[in-house]
Amino acid sequence: MEVKTLANIKSAIKRAELNVKQNEKNSAQKSALRTVIKAFKANPTEEAFRAASASIDKAASKGLIHKNKASRDKSRLAAKLAN
């Protein structure tokens, strides 16, 4: 894979390539997370809440989002479910 970078050092070039791959992976995972949350907001059911909550927890455990953001998101979804 050819990555446009200003790096001259071999290890820096490799890190730039890895950063691109990781960015693509993280973007895809964040997009999937947002999709699950939007699905819950469109149709707030207990089953959709469980799916969204599980996705949020998984993202937080993998470091995709901060644990405080995960907690805040789950709290807001639970409040929406209660109403």
Curated annotation (Swiss-Prot):
GO molecular function: small ribosomal subunit rRNA binding; structural constituent of ribosome
SUPFAM superfamilies (alphabetical): Ribosomal protein S20
Pfam families named among the record's database cross-references: Ribosomal_S20p
Gene3D superfamilies recorded: Ribosomal protein S20
GO CC terms: cytosol; small ribosomal subunit
Annotated stretches, region: Disordered: 60-83
Function: Binds directly to 16S ribosomal RNA.
PANTHER family: 30S RIBOSOMAL PROTEIN S20, SMALL RIBOSOMAL SUBUNIT PROTEIN BS20C
Family statement: Belongs to the bacterial ribosomal protein bS20 family.
NCBIfam families noted in UniProt: S20
Protein known as: Small ribosomal subunit protein bS20
Organism: Streptococcus thermophilus (strain ATCC BAA-250 / LMG 18311)
